[in-house]
Swiss-Prot record:
It is found in: Plastid, Chloroplast; Cytoplasm, Cytosol. This is 6-phosphogluconate dehydrogenase, decarboxylating 3, chloroplastic. NADP(+) binds at residues 13-18, 36-38, 80-82, 108. It comes from Arabidopsis thaliana. Belongs to the 6-phosphogluconate dehydrogenase family. InterPro entries: 6-PGluconate_DH-like_C_sf (IPR008927), 6PGD_dom2 (IPR013328), 6PGDH_C (IPR006114), 6PGDH_Gnd/GntZ (IPR006113), 6PGDH_NADP-bd (IPR006115), NAD(P)-bd_dom_sf (IPR036291), Pgluconate_DH (IPR006183). The modification N-acetylmethionine is found at residue 1. Signal peptide: none annotated.
Length: 487
């Protein structure tokens, strides 16, 4: 009889994400125990559970009572701040857990921390999952994208719960077993890196349309609404159209124009760029988006630079660049440039996942990654279905850029893409994401690059040797001596 009263699963960490995920689980018919070190959050969650449909949520006020209220083998989700708080929570809960029980960390954790915790958990006979959760507060409550990696046994213990709780799309729930070790956290990290790129590219489209095209916020709202009905249909494009419509409560006009132009960040974009560098994977669009966040933080320096350079004679070119612009054509060009740039950004993210999968032996299914990102998550977009199909057609696809369907689209959008970047440059408007994407495309598609000169330079000053195009082997040349002889 005792087991009847036990919860199916537990969740510790009741900030908004934790509360919403717990209520989502309960809403799907799974009795859940909840715990938070600050006990007022437990009461808050219980109040919400009552108000949102008398959901089966049991509040617990100590680690011991919490753990013992869950049926064996116990599965406990932790949603606390990454780093030391996770270790502290694990320590408090594992004291009362038994071999075969499972801990699931749902935070944005560095993947190597997850791999360390897997080893530590195994010593106690515990199972461990590092699970990326994307979708923000709304996604956690109504259906997120879930990326669990680690113990396959632990995944199977909660698979039925995760599949009901996750966002649902036409080809299934937005969750799959990612792979061993810290793969779930790594995939979520790359998701966030792609998200950085997406947001940067959208902000550049906005900048060009507003400052070169002279479009109002009302016009921008309509344009993004229209774009969200086509190839650019996505969560980020949808919310952007909403943002342009919100009026300022404290004054005239729209709120977006009153927001300080300094972008915050929590570190996952930086981790993505660092991992790309470690694995020798080119990810210039994601890197450019990170650099832009750093530069946005230099507000005082940027204002001073604008003043100093104006005094030095730099003239504002936006006005001259915008004169005579065909608005209709510009809008369509920007749409095409945004789409082509996005393909490059996603290609970079997917290539990073593949490189890490090869290094770690995770055997990541890139088509499945695209599928579970189709719903619930921040980067959900209609064209993820086409990315899924590209990897289903060819699991060993070197890059999305060379998938036959995407290749045609890139070629079709080239002229518009170049016009937008050229116009922005002539207007003095920075579009680092679009420029990085275009440079990536142009570099990747060239059969021969000027890297031959770089190799010659390296050989001259460092005797690093070089290869030839016409015969095998490594060669070294006494460049300076031969150059002087020929003078």
């Amino acid at each position: 009889m005792e087991s009847v009263a036990l919860s199916r699963i537990g969740l510790a960490g009741l900030a908004v994400m934790g509360q919403n995920l717990a209520l989502n689980i309960a809403d799907k018919g799974f009795p859940i125990s909840v715990y938070n070190r600050t006990t007022s959050k437990v009461d808050e969650t219980l109040d919400r559970a009552s108000n949102e449909g008398k959901l089966p949520v049991a509040g617990q006020y100590s680690p011991r009572d919490f753990v013992l209220s869950i049926q064996r083998p116990r599965s406990v989700i932790i949603l606390v701040k990454a780093g030391a708080p996770v270790d502290q929570t694990i320590s408090a809960l594992s004291e009362y857990m038994e071999p075969g029980d499972c801990i699931i960390d749902g935070g944005n954790e560095w993947y190597q921390n997850t791999e360390r915790r897997i080893v530590e958990a195994e010593k106690k006979g515990l199972l461990y999952l590092g699970m990326g959760v994307s979708g923000g507060e709304e996604g956690a409550r109504n259906g997120p994208s879930l990326m669990p990696g680690g113990s396959f046994t632990a995944y199977n213990n909660v698979k039925d719960i995760l599949e009901k709780v996750a966002a649902q799309v036409e080809d299934g729930p937005c969750v799959t077993y990612i792979g061993e070790g810290g793969s779930g956290n790594f995939v979520k990290m790359v998701h966030n890196g792609i998200e950085y790129g997406d947001m940067q590219l959208i902000s550049e489209a906005y900048d060009v349309l507003k400052n070169v095209g002279g479009l109002s916020n009302d016009e921008l709202a309509e344009i993004f609404t229209e774009w969200n009905r086509g190839e650019l249909e996505s969560f980020l494009v949808e919310i952007t159209s909403d943002i342009f419509r919100v009026k300022d409560d404290y004054g005239d006009g729209e709120l977006v124009d009153k927001i300080l132009d300094k972008t915050g960040m929590k570190g996952t974009g930086k981790w993505t760029v660092q991992q790309a560098a470690e694995l020798s994977v080119a990810a210039p669009t994601i890197a450019a988006s990170l650099d832009c966040r750093y530069l946005s933080g230099l507000k005082d320096e940027r204002e001073n630079a604008a003043k100093v350079l104006e005094e030095a004679g730099l003239k504002e070119d936006i006005g001259s660049a915008s004169r005579g612009v065909d608005k209709k054509r510009l809008i369509d060009d920007v749409r095409q440039a945004l789409y082509a740039s996005k393909i490059c950004s996603y290609a970079q993210g997917m290539n990073l996942l593949r490189a890490k999968s090869l290094e770690k032996g995770w055997d990541l299914n890139l088509g499945e990654m695209a599928r579970i990102w189709k719903g619930g998550c921040i980067i959900r977009a209609v064209f993820l279905d086409r990315i899924k199909k590209a990897y289903q057609r060819n699991p060993n696809l070197a890059s999305l850029v060379v998938d036959p369907d995407f290749a045609k689209e890139m070629v079709q959008r080239q002229a518009a893409w170049r016009r937008v970047v050229g116009l922005a440059i002539s207007a003095g408007i920075s579009t680092p994401g679009m420029c990085a994407s275009l440079a990536y495309f142009d570099t990747y598609r060239r059969a021969r690059l000027p890297a031959n000169l770089v190799q010659a330079q390296r050989d001259l000053f460092g005797a690093h040797t070089y290869e030839r195009t016409d015969r095998p082997g490594a060669y070294h040349t006494e460049w300076t001596k031969l150059a002087r002889k020929s003078q």
